[in-house]
Amino acid sequence: MSVRTLPLLFLNLGGEMLYILDQRLRAQNIPGDKARKDEWTEVDRKRVLNDIISTMFNRKFMEELFKPQELYSKKALRTVYERLAHASIMKLNQASMDKLYDLMTMAFKYQVLLCPRPKDVLLVTFNHLDTIKGFIRDSPTILQQVDETLRQLTEIYGGLSAGEFQLIRQTLLIFFQDLHIRVSMFLKDKVQNNNGRFVLPVSGPVPWGTEVPGLIRMFNNKGEEVKRIEFKHGGNYVPAPKEGSFELYGDRVLKLGTNMYSVNQPVETHVSGSSKNLASWTQESIAPNPLAKEELNFLARLMGGMEIKKPSGPEPGFRLNLFTTDEEEEQAALTRPEELSYEVINIQATQDQQRSEELARIMGEFEITEQPRLSTSKGDDLLAMMDEL
C-alpha cells in the first residue's frame, strides 16, 4: 500500500463531485430576474462552487492531506465529502448524497482503470484541477489556492519512479475493487456491463513510450536481433501522439479526468441497484469497525484543517436534488438499506488528551441542529454548517 495515494484519491474524487454539482446546478438555473426566493440562480451556482473549492483547497487542509499516510475506509472518506458538499448554502438529503458519492467513485475508478500508464493518474489529477480552475476564474484568491496545490503535486509526485506510481495505482484499485455500481451514462456508452464491471477498450493510443502490438523480436545470446514474427492482436491500436505535460501549465493530452458532463449529450446520472451493489458498505455498517478510532483520528487531522465559513445572516439553504424528480429521490430514500444508516460509536481514547480534545471538537461539528421548516423547496432541512475551526 502506498502512503502517497490519499491526495490523489481526494483531489480526483473532489473534482468529480464538483463536476456533478456544477451540472445539476446549471440544469436547475433560473434567470436572476425571474427566480423566486426558492429557486437556483447563476449567482447561487457560482457561490456554491466557490465556497466548496475554497474549503477543499484550504492551505492547512492541504498540508495535512499531503503528509504520507495510509488510506482509510470508504466511510471515513465519505464523511469528509459529505461535510464538504454542505460547506455552502446547498443542502443534499441522504439519498442524493448516496447518489453523488456513487457517481464520484465510479467515475474515478473508470479513469484509474483506463490510465495507459500508472504515472498517468497524475495527468488525470491535473485535468481535474485544470477544470476546477475554470470554475473559479473570477476568484483570484481561490485560484491561488488551487495553483499552490498544483505546485505541491508537481514537487511531490514529479520525481516518483514508475514502480512507485504502479504501487499508487494498485492501492487505488484495491480501494475500488468491491464497487460495481451501475451508472446509466456508462451503460449507454457501453463502457460498463450490466454486472457493474467496466469494459476495457482494445483500441486507441498505446501508452507513451511503447509500440503498437503486433511484432515479436527474437534475439540471440549476443543481444543481436535474429528474427521477427508478426501476429494479429485483434485490436485497433495507434501510437501515442505525444506525452502529456506534467508541468503546472500545458497540454495534458490525456482526456481522462476532464468534465464528462460538459459535452452535449443527455446527462443521465441514474445509479442502478445501489442498494444491492454496496455490500462492502453494508458490512462496514453492520459490524463495528475495529479501525474506528484510527479513522476518527484521521478525520480529526483532515477536518481540523478545514475552515468552513458560516453563512452570514438568517439565509435559508438551497436544496439540490441529484435525481430527475422528487418522487425518484423519495423512492431511493425508501429503498436505502437500514444497514447503511450511520450509527454512533463511543470510543474511549483517554491516553492522548490532546487528540481526544481534537476529536471531541471535530465530532461536535458533525452534530445537526434543528432548523425551522420553511415553505421553500430549497430551504428546508438545511444541515447546520460546521463552525469555523
Swiss-Prot record:
For this entry, the protein name equals: Protein OSCP1
Gene for this protein? OSCP1
* Known role: May be involved in drug clearance in the placenta.
State the Gene Ontology BP annotations: xenobiotic detoxification by transmembrane export across the plasma membrane
MF-aspect GO terms: transmembrane transporter activity
Tissue expression from the record: Expressed predominantly in testis, also found in placenta and to a lesser extent in thymus and small intestine; abundantly expressed in tumor-derived cell lines. Ubiquitously expressed.
The question of whether Transport is a record keyword is answered with yes
Per the UniProt entry, what species is this protein from, by scientific name? Homo sapiens
Please tell me what else the database record remarks about this protein. May be involved in the development and/or progression of nosopharyngeal carcinoma.
Assigned keywords, A-Z: Cell membrane, Membrane, Transport
**Keyword Membrane attributed:** yes
- Would you indicate the residue range of the signal peptide? none
- Cross-referenced InterPro entries, in alphabetical order? OSCP1
> Which PANTHER family is this protein grouped with?
OXIDORED-NITRO DOMAIN-CONTAINING PROTEIN, PROTEIN OSCP1
Q: Would you say which domain of life the source belongs to?
A: Eukaryota
Provide the transmembrane region boundaries: none
Its cellular-component GO annotations read: basal plasma membrane; cytoplasm; plasma membrane
Its subcellular locations are: Basal cell membrane
